[in-house]
Amino acid sequence: MESFKELAREYDEKFKAFQDDLQKWEETSERKEYAEFHRVQAESEFPELKREREDRERWARAERIRGEDEKSMLAKEHADKKIRLGVAKIPRLLTESERKMDEFVERPGSILKDMKKEHRQSVLDRLEEWSPEERSLFKSRQADHVKIFHGLTEFFVDKTASDLVLFYYMNKKTEDYKKDFKPKKRVTKYKVGAFPSVEELAYFRMMPPLDFSSFPKNSLMCYFCCRTVNGIDLNGTFMPKEAYEIFAICPDEDRVVCSGCREEAAKLYKDNRCFGNRCSNQKKRANRVNRNIPLDFADFPVRTRAFIMDKLGSTRVAVKFCTPCKNALTRWINDVNNKEETIMAELLNYEGQVGWTDDEKTKLVTLINSSPTLDWVSISEGMNRRPNECKMQYDAMNGVKTQPMIEEVDEEDGNGQEEGGDALVNTPTTSSAAARRSGLARNAKKPVRTPRAPRSAGGRRTGGAVTRAQAVPKPVEDLGEEIDEMEIEDNDEDASRGSRGKDSKAPSDRDGSPADMEGDSPEGQDQDADQDQDQDQDVDEEEEEVIVRDIDSPVKTLLSPKILSGGHKPDFPPVPRIQKPSTSSQPPPPEPMDTKENESDDGEEDNDILEIDVDEPPAKRPTPTSSSSHLIGSSSVGGSERELGGRGLVQQQQQQQPQAQSAAPPVTVSTAAAATAERLVNATSPSPSVASQHLVPTETSTSVPPVTIVPPAIQQPVVVISGAAPQFTQQQTTHSPALIAQPIPQQLIPQRVSTPAQILTPTPVRPTAASTPSMDQFLGLFKQQQQQQQQQPQQSNLMQQLGNINPQFLALLLQQQQQQQQVQQAQVQAAQTQGSLTSGTPFQAQQRPDEALQKLFSSPEMLGTLLNAKYQFPQFPQAIQQNPLLMNAQHQLILQQQQLAMQHAQAQAAQAAQAQAAQAAQAQAQAQAEAKLKTQAAQAKAQADAQARVQTQQQAHLKAQAQAQYQMNRPQLIPASVQMPIGINTAYHQKSLTPSETSASATPPAHRPRAATTVGSKMPAGRSNVQEAELRTLKEELIKRIRLFRDRIAEDAHLKREEENIVTYTAQIQASRVQYNTEILGQMKQRYEQAAARRIEIVKELDEPAKFINGVQNKFNDFSVFKLDEIDRQTLHEILQRYAAEQKPDQLQQQQNDFHNLLRQNNIGIRQAQYPALQASPHQAAIIQHQQQQEAFKKLQQQHQDAQKRKLEAPVSSATPQVKRIALSQSSPVQRFSQHPNGTLPHNLAVVYQNKMPQDREKLLQEQQLNQYLFAAQQQHLQQQQQHHGTQPEQKSKRKSGIESITSMQGAPHRHIQLAGPSSSRIQSGRGVSPALSASRSVAPTISGAAGRSITAGTSGHSSTSDYNKELAERMNEVFKPTHPQLLQTKASAMNSNAVSPANTNNSDEIECVYQGPPKTPASIKRLQPTEGPRTLSGQRMKSILSVPAHQRRSSIPPVKTEDEAMECLSMMMYEEAKAPPSDRIVTKLISSSEAAAAANPSAKFSYLDIFNDVVKRDEERCQRMLQSTSVLQPSRELDAFLQQLQQNPQQYANLSAAEKLALQQYQIHSAHQKSQQQAQLQAAQQLQQQQQARPDHYEKFHLLRPNAEIVRPIPTTFSHFLNKATTSTVSSSASAPQFLQPPAAASIAAPTPISTPHAMPSPSVGVQTAPPTPQAVHHPVMPIIPGKPSSVNSNVSDVSSDDDDVRNPEKLPANRLPPLPGDKTAFRSVIDLRATGHVAVTKKIPVKYPLVVQAQNGIQPIKDYGPPCKNLVYEDLSDDE
């Protein structure tokens, strides 16, 4: 503390010294002068300070000061001093505890050890942020702005002035900026550099890159060249806001400009060169670039402007021109306005709107060279352009001077020029073809103009500007409209001269000036060069005058309309212009116009209006250009020049109009509800609610004044005259039962000039003179009021008597009578007809419930008064009882009120019934319409499905050819005779307007909406797209239901209070022990019931809004997109809470029902309700998936067994004893039991296990383990037995060698199936293995549980249990691999081939095919193929019967009536018999023998119905034998039958004994254990495969490209016609190929197919005896036959990802197929060409240009060609070295 005291003492001393120094400083003269100066300045700004100072001085000079005044002054001074001194308060000292609370905060890097190094590093880091584009931009702009760094910051996005200064001085020595500075004269005074202009910023400002992921695909388009800006093919940015003024674009719209247009325009602007192509020498002083585009040029359509710019040879991002180019441009504009024949013919034949890029020209040359003849139709399809356009470009590139499509008239004849230019420019003159030259031919021969390139001094020009691709072409129908508009405007002589500007050099008819066009072309400049030099001085004076005018005038360009930014245009004295309408809230006053002038012109009444369909596509809407713009803006604040017929017409109207006459401005009727929607019609398309409120004059033949519909009295219309201040007066409500119609003064209707006649049907007015329920109610109330007035004297006497008894009650009755009168007045007002045609409200307002007359006892105010204690309610009835007269009067009064209430209730009931009937009728109509639509949709769908089924096979055969043709040339779906609109891509229409694929042309198809590029049809700020319209509609529906919910809730609360009041009032009356009237209580009860019923209806009505709002919430998840008010959001929250509370009991009930259903399905007998709802576990899902896999595996085995056994139906000489083969899927009854949906599942057993006691759990676990072991041993024994009998070829003493086994495959192919197992890899790795065996590894094995054996091994080939488990896991992995059915069929076809594969052998010449001869079965036999799925009712009955095994089936087969049903049933029986041994196939043998007999004797009668009847008889005999048999069934069959019955009837499980239940549990435990083991093996195999796939492949030199999509590649085969068109096979399948599972198909008979027999070739080394190749029923397109070399083979179709050459599974490949080690360069390699599709997806990496902006990754992957499609691919022989 002593240290603190010393510190405090030192502080006080220093503070005192500071105060002394401060006082001395304040007394100095400098301080006083400073204070005096600032005091004077402050007092001049704030006079009250001066008054306060003078008051203080006056009080100080006073001799006597009163005590109170002195105190107040001193207090005020003290307060001021305290305020001044309290600004900086002295901080207090810290205490000991606060000082101990200080903690040390470590901040690494806060101490700089080497400041110079850190500073240098920071500078380098800041310099590294500069991209190359930013560096070049800074260097180019530095030369113009020197060191105005704050101005240079305008060109950058994220750079400050300090960054620019640092960059400048750090690169000053290396870049040498001073060499680019313009040399200036030395001046004495420093002159500030020029700040960047608006035009310069428009060209050079760097904009942030676009986030293409936030925009729809191919939705961004360059505003100038109309090419797609997607960030891959073409980059672009948003246009700077400064460019909107330069290019005359609406500032409310965001426009995109591509990088090419910006670079081209910036290059021309930087060099200060003319944008045109007609000036030959810009060094001349007369050709300075200082002329803007004429102001009227923006009024032309896009097509006309593109035509003029191409004729001028100018780029389309044009801003300024020289004098010759400007004169030529003005002359052509006048020719178009005057509709000269020559230029109109050129305009009609104009097709050069879209320019050709260099890539397109190269592609055109390639297509022409590849075409044997000049087939322009096919070339145009490849180019995505019109044939005529391709031919024109071809002629232009070859320099062929044919008849040009566009002819330009450079100037008049030389004779006319020499004579002094007497001929006018607009007069068409005939000239020879030699005097004219084609603009397209001249521009095609000119090279690309480069900046700062010197131009030739004399002769014609040889260089020109490259025209860019332009806007969307104008369709043919729009061109016709444009011609019609020109013809209409041609009737007005003065309208055609309104487009000449003041600064134009073109001749004019008004001033009669001669033509000054001598220097507007290179010819005129070359001929009159000397005259130009002599007239330099005169031209300079004219240019200076024109420059002054052009500076003030806004800059106009090609694709820009008039500026809508609200600025005023320059007012030219000779031709006054009409101001464009502004988008601001206060529009400027329009120009006056004569209302009667139109009648004197044509004698027609132009009171028609143009109807605009808001839902129409933008391309078909009338654009506000030329003659249609004044139609849209007819009811707005002004118009353009063309809206009033051109400048000449405007001037003529102003001259003919008297001075005193002034036309009234247009009138706009707006209501309070539509105040926010007030906007100009020509700026935005009117919405239905706003557009309907504008005055619409109807077209009539008589002089009937227009009728305006006045809105209801609630929303009094306010007539606002544009240009004048609105007068706000007191709104007075007028009531009239009839329709309110007021004539509008003729002066308020704006005149329309040069408007084509439009027929507008007037809106029919609905009559309201008929009687309505509301009017009848009004008359009834009026009669009641008259009766009450007649009874008023009697009631007054009663009231006097009542007042003597109870004055308070009398006052209450008087108040109630006043309320009744007010209600009647309100009803009278509500009964009047009010409404509006425009707003959509009905003329007959419905009566609200709260407006009805209420009864005395049901009134809330009356009940509240009666319930109040101060009125002494019990005393009143006693007083009435004492006077019988008063009692009678009271009863009469109550009865009257009851009658009134009854009438009111009846009226309300009638209205409610009418409303319900209307709603029911509307709902019925809507339901009928929906049913009709559904019926039509179903019929259309059925029709489409039928057509699709008919065309399936044809499309399949043409699929391969169509795919190959699609890669090169797309098919021409649109005939060549159909002429598409100009600029529309044919391929785009072929793909149904879906630009999903990248076009081959650099110019994209013109599928953009015209509203985005056309001048007159731009998308206004108020117009929304489809999504916004949908959101708006949803918002309206949402608000409508929210308000309905709010109203119903309020009504429900009101009814609830009413019910409570009635209950309370009834209880009080009954408790008062007074004699009361039963009728009153009856009425109160009735009212209570009505309120309760209404509340129930309200609850039902609230369900629909709640469901609708819940659906909207599920769709959007957030209501912020609708921008609701706070009250609506609260109501929305209440609705959702209410809906959730209502749905919660239903959800709980559903969960409980599901739980009870699950318990009922349990066969163990669990009935306890305390168990929770059982959820599906991952283990259960895995078991279900495994069951499905088992079913598929079982079907695959049966199909293969059927194919193998049907082929070997012929009896053998020495038949081996048949042993019953029990498959895994058939021998396990527990497995079939578990597959039943209602069977006991593992989760049920788990519940039982948890419910046991600990001792019982251990016992049950031991039993389970024992049973599992016994069951596994039994299954293993059965499987080994099956393998032994299925694979035992002969006795062990007669074992054959490997070669002999291969040779004996034809005799017993079923015995050699095991060679396809995994253990046969030893044989496959060597030589002499059949390719069919090697190829069979890529598909599933054919026999369950069969292990492969080695031929050269000394053992018998039987595998152990571990081998079996391993093989089972491998088979599961192969069988259930997600493969396409098409690929499965292809593999099946490949299996049938026994040819030699060069990929499987080292030397293909050592093995050759040996063919035994034709098959024994005739090729013409027709066979019935087995099918599984039923198609008819008989088939379904047959399937249910066949589901029971034959040895357990007690019922016989029902007979059928038709041949088709018999064929279906027989095919299903054949399918079921295929699962059984060959000895049990009775039906199959019967059908085969009948078919063979029919084939041997074609004349004999053959019918499948007779065969089926024979089968039915045999089945009946079998049933009789089973009934007569008394033998005891075997235990296994007995168990199967019992389990089958238990599956069909699960309820029998409850009747079982404990021992039977325990047995079932044990079987279930066995099945669960087996499934878990198989699932674990399957998961292990999948994990192993995933690890192998994820293993990095360092084999880079011969790495095979494997795209994600399935690739069809060739596989060798010797059978030429391996794919047939027939749907069924005529011969049996091969021995080594399984039959894959097919979808259910109808039994069909295939026609006999000729079989091509391969020739037999002798083999010197090894003879491989194989089965003859057979075609398969594969639904694939027919592939072309590939001719091969003698050692080559034809190709088949397969999947590249098969295990035959899969590098990802090296352990499954033979040694010669494994890839070598990464470092081993000596090992041989096998190369396989996988370029099958011709395209491989390659991701293009885009470098980040701006590090500070986060760019989303672009998901679009360009397609990179790696060669043509696989055609005529021939495999070469691969030697060992290769």
From Swiss-Prot:
PROSITE patterns assigned to the protein according to its UniProt record, in alphabetical order: MYB_LIKE, SANT
Instruction: Please indicate which superkingdom the organism of origin belongs to.
Output: Eukaryota
Record's compositionally biased regions (Low complexity):
431-442, 450-469, 626-639, 649-671, 1276-1285, 1687-1696
Q: Where is the Myb-like domain?
A: 356-398
**UniProt feature, compositional bias: Acidic residues:** 409-421, 478-493, 517-545, 599-616
State whether keyword Transcription applies.
Answer: yes
Might you name a Gene Ontology BP term for this protein?
regulation of transcription by RNA polymerase II
Listed CDD domains:
SANT
Q: Which GO terms describe its molecular function?
A: DNA binding
Q: GO cellular component annotations, sorted alphabetically?
A: chromatin; nucleus; protein-containing complex
Question: For the SANT domain, which residue ranges apply?
Answer: 125-176
Q: What happens biologically when this protein's gene is inactivated, per the record?
A: Mutant animals display a progressive defect in locomotion starting at the L2 stage, showing delayed response to prodding, irregular thrashing movements and a low pharyngeal pumping rate. Worms have shorter body length, convoluted intestine and develop gonadogenesis defects including loss of spermathecae, sterility and larval arrest at L4 stage. They also show abnormal cholinergic signaling leading to early onset of paralysis in the presence of aldicarb, an acetylcholinesterase inhibitor. RNAi-mediated knockdown results in enlargement of mitochondria in the body wall muscle.
Listed A to Z, the keywords are:
DNA-binding, Nucleus, Repressor, Transcription, Transcription regulation
Under the heading InterPro entries, the entry gives: N-CoR_corepressor, SANT/Myb, SANT_dom
Localization per record = Nucleus
Of which family is this protein a member? Belongs to the N-CoR nuclear receptor corepressors family.
Assembly information from the UniProt record: Interacts with gex-3. Interacts (via C-terminus) with nhr-60.
Protein name per its UniProtKB record: Nuclear receptor corepressor 1
- Species this chain originates from: Caenorhabditis elegans
